[in-house]
């Protein structure tokens, strides 16, 4: 596919008219160097380490994403969803930037000026490190945005549980109850 870098608005409008309002998105595969893939996200096993062993195995499939990953050594477009039109592709980020409220609706466009969410299939063999996703209010306190993602674990893709369905949380010695609440 030829990658189009700019001026995608007319392509988007033509595709929306031709498909009754749909844009086809290619899968956005995301590797994680610190987790073991569960191999249930409809990626051929030979492609699990397509980015190289140093990058880790692909264990996430992002949907409708205009967000790049925060992975070390990532490709510039890692995490971005691509719209596929004929033999061309362009990022959903580009499409939203050029088409605005046509794609995301007036209220979302007015409030955020972008598409602020994405979803993912998330598939690991073992437990993930305990972590939290801050709300917009919490994240603003440290100069960040809230984490705009959701998880879905479809039962038809999870007929076998992972090999250790637990997670652990530890606190720095001296951490107070008030600090945890904060």
Predicted regions and their residues:
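Catalytic-pocket segment enriched in acidic/His residues
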Residues: 180-182
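Transition-metal
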Residues: 2-178
